[in-house]
Amino acid sequence: MDAVQTPIQAIRSAVEMFVFACFVNDAIGTNRITLNNFNQQTKLEDDGKGLVIKHGFTDAQLKADGRNLVLMALASTALATDKSMDVVYGDKYPDDTSELGSARAIMYQIRCAFAHDLLVPIWIPKPKYKHTYRVTVNVRRESGTTTPRTIELDMSTLGGKHLSIADFGNFGGYFGLLEYCFQKVQSDPKGNTAYPLPVEE
């Protein structure tokens, strides 16, 4: 596994994995990846003897796993982006409803929703985050152009509800939010600083 070295690389790697998951899911859905592509076992190599995993899939399981792969990869983009923004900008301030503050708060709440349940994400904002956050992002079109889209979340109304991609502008809005955050990280010198290792408490 390649080590992530900077906040910029962290976001890029997570987005790359999300895009990869989308392509895999599409290939499964269009039968370009089928049960015939899989062996009945695989081996995870490590410094020891490795681990052999034996498993058989059904067609329904394969399709469900493809969709879940996309969902989990999306969660990883929120986690990587939230942490990268923390590395570059420091602690978040829930009362900050500026565009940057809103982008950070929205990304953090998406991250937290997945943390509560990875496959069934739920909004559970803390009271201090129950503000309305608003940020305008650029959504890419097939033509190569972009159009502005405003993402607005009133966190006081979302508590306990299942997260829906429509809550933050669908996939176009979410990719626009990722791009907004990435550009902020990329434009700051700290975006190229060493990505901190976890600290034991």
Language-model-detected regions and their locations in the chain:
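Histidine-centered, metal-coordinating catalytic motifs and their short helical/loop contexts
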Residues: 101-126
